[in-house]
Amino acid sequence: MMVMIDFKEIEKKWQKRWEEAKIFEANPDDREKFFITAAFPYLNGVLHAGHLRTFTIPEVVARFQRMKNKNVLWTFGYHVTGTPILGLAELIKNRDEKTIWAYTELHGIPKEELLELTTPEKIVEYFSKKAEEAFKRMGFSLDWRRNFKTDDKVFNKFIEWQFHKLKEKGLIVKGSHPVRYCPRCDNPVEDHDILVGENATLVEYILIKFTTEDGCIMPMATLRPETVFGVTNVWVNPEATYVKAKVYLEKETENGIELIENGIWIMAKECAEKLKHQDRKIEIIEEFKGEQLINKKVKNPVTGKEVPILPAKFVKTNIGTGCVMSVPAHAPYDYIALRDLGLVDEIGLIPLINVPGYGKYPAKEIVEKMGIKSQEEEDKLEEATKKIYKDEFHKGVLNENCLDYEGIPVREIKDKLTKDLIDKGLAEIMYEFSEEKVICRCGTPCIVKMVKGQWFIKYSDEKWKELAHKCIDKMRFIPENLRQVFHEKIDWMKDKACVRRRGLGTKFPFEEGWVIESLSDSTIYPAYYTVAKYINQHNIKPEQLTLELFDYVFLGKGDVDKIAKETGIPKDIIEGMRKEFIYYYPVDWRCSAKDLIPNHLTFYIFNHVAIFPEEFWPRGIVVNGYVTIEGKKLSKSKGPVLPVLEVAEKFGADVGRFYITTCAELPQDADIKFKEMENTKKVLERLYLFAKEIAERRGETGEEFSYIDKWLLSRLYKAVKQYDEYMENFELRKAGILLYQLLDDLKWYRRRGGNNIRVLEEFLEVIIKLMMPFTPHLCEEMWEILGKEGFVSLAKFPEVKEEFINDEIEKGEEYLKAVMEDIKEIINVAKVQPKRIYLYTADDWKYEILKIIKENEGKTIKELMPIIMKNPEFRKYGKEIPKLVNQLIKLNAEIINEVEVLENAKEFLKKEVGVEDIIINGEDKANKKRVAIPFKPAIYLE
């Protein structure tokens, strides 16, 4: 029966000792530094399973790098900027039922404690304590002297400095700009503020101004303006509500807003509502159903051609204008709709793009090829549309129907044509969300709003983008394919609203009444970690943190004596801050989940290259997948959540750490399964009991190394080598599998009769060090019971003893396992229990052929045969040889002394398969020896 081990007591004991000894406090010295950070948590709830994965990855790597004698800086701050915490305080104050349920049932907060959290300050204080408790309970090796919150007055001064630097470079600008906006909160919203659709971006629709017979403008919304050359008709939804409205453009002037007449428009009612928020004034003249427009004609402003208005129920009026161009030669939806109306021949198709691999009419071709019968087959139509659009974008070239644009590749036309159409007054821009639903945390549907007098960070600046691309080219990315993703994000980046009217955070230094928003104050804060310990320990006041001070500390500018005098901060402290920044910066690795790629991580690169010299630019980014629980997606409001403290309580910190970092490859999503966590716990319990057993045998005299001793040591040191490589590259799952394999090797060693205390002690000492980054509490406990000095958390990484690595012994043991399995299988099939077993190894000539195969690694059978047949000795075996070569390649046979391996393991094999005797290469029973091949002996039961 398994002895119960009190993991929690072990954890408490070592957490206390680490804290008392302050072993994770990092200070500059003469060692190589290693600075690793993770995106700090937002304090509107407890740390959960998603945080656990994202934060434990750098935690494990930080501990590993300490073993490699690096001076590791690893710490955390807390993000509280913006409106979510304000919103939560209001919901709790108003006793909102859904909120009370979510925070008591899912986040595990006692109701009486939750109901006290009625102000933002109380929420920040409560959840910062909960976060600290979670980090400590999980055994995180953090330097707590550097902790801060983003509403700390001292941190606000740092953010003010950041914004002054951006403004000096012309990267903070004021103007009108489209933003995601909540009408109820009366504020732009960022990812953190959004309940549904947090990944929604702004999409630029081009409104091409077709005109009706009575001179009204009918704007066609499109993402592909080049298709205007292939329009055969336009679609409206006959059942939807449309409006005729007077449209004015709103232009900002010194005297206020000037209205410029922009014609009478016909559009969907929803579109008119949206355009009111996008620099336009709308005066509705009349409302009517779309059916009233059917069979009327409109004029294409680009080609001059008149085309009919036709009905299509697939037209969505909640996106764009509710008026859609029909291009049936290239759009499967349009072709099918026209075919259903029986109008293909009458209206005709107009091709506009030549695409390799397609005929004149790609849409017609793909619809017929896929057998699409009607508009009801939406999945097939969607698939066909995506395929054509992809092929046209990457390989298509505009044809002669595109007038002056003939010969231009599709991928290059959009910006040029859009600019030309706008310059000629034939088109305008309208903004939509990339997702249908975008809902603020307050529950209100968001809109796209053109905000006037708004402050932006000018991420569209081309020179700034060049620097960001340069940085990306020099960085390391895990996984590597992120490099291209970041290049694309930089290219697509547009100006971004950086302030809002309410919320926690830093007051905007250039105009009163604004607060810097949450994705703008969370970009360069790792630099603040390097100096936060001085600010915290020396109780430096906000007013002492001047722009000149930060210029000196982070940029080396200014006179330190003058700054010391003006700020009242002693010169040695200022110089210490500067020294610490230079020593630890840049950040070696920035870790985050993949949801932060399009915002936080991209802004992290942008802001670093704008503010710091090149030597301090980021060196690497690591991104992990999401977390699900028993197949269910995490949700803070609906569940499941799985708080970190619950993991520590139910399973233990070490179990949680080891499981969450090794249950999935880094880029993959990790699905937490509680049964697997229980199994992890059992593995750790067995390891601990093994350590206790070895501790009790201390003082025993070891023996000379036997064959099986040498095998275990070879496996051990080969694993150390491999583990080192995996951990350097954040391949934690592979490192975890390696550790499980080592524990299996130990099991096999003991099954083979291995019991040499010298070997067992060495094995245990090494595996404790390898396990330590994952399971530090248990490893400290085992280290102590073995009588080792100091903390294993500070022990040196095991040295690889190359002299013990022996491929031949390892191959021999692999061979033995295979032979044993073959014998057991034959006994099982024969359904008899033999008294003795005859084993026959291959004839010598077969080994000669294996040698030729090994010397010509990678060659095919066809290439190997002439080489083998050069030797006249082999010719007599004729047809046997191709078959043998094929078998040896498939088996991946190795050259070893099979007889020696079998003789050494004879007693073991007899015991394992339950026979009286095993005879090796004895009397050839039933002519069996002829079927033996290298690495696969023939077997005869008697």
Curated annotation (Swiss-Prot):
It is found in: Cytoplasm. It comes from the Archaea. It catalyses: tRNA(Leu) + L-leucine + ATP = L-leucyl-tRNA(Leu) + AMP + diphosphate. It holds the Pfam family Anticodon_1. A motif ('KMSKS' region) lies at residues 633-637. GO terms for biological process: leucyl-tRNA aminoacylation. GO terms for cellular component: cytoplasm. Its EC number is 6.1.1.4. GO terms for molecular function: aminoacyl-tRNA deacylase activity; ATP binding; leucine-tRNA ligase activity. ATP binds at residue 636. Keywords: Aminoacyl-tRNA synthetase, ATP-binding, Cytoplasm, Ligase, Nucleotide-binding, Protein biosynthesis. A motif ('HIGH' region) lies at residues 41-51. Belongs to the class-I aminoacyl-tRNA synthetase family. NCBIfam families: leuS_arch, PRK12300.1. This is Leucine--tRNA ligase. It comes from Methanocaldococcus jannaschii (strain ATCC 43067 / DSM 2661 / JAL-1 / JCM 10045 / NBRC 100440). The lineage of its organism: Archaea, Methanobacteriati, Methanobacteriota, Methanomada group, Methanococci. The gene is leuS.
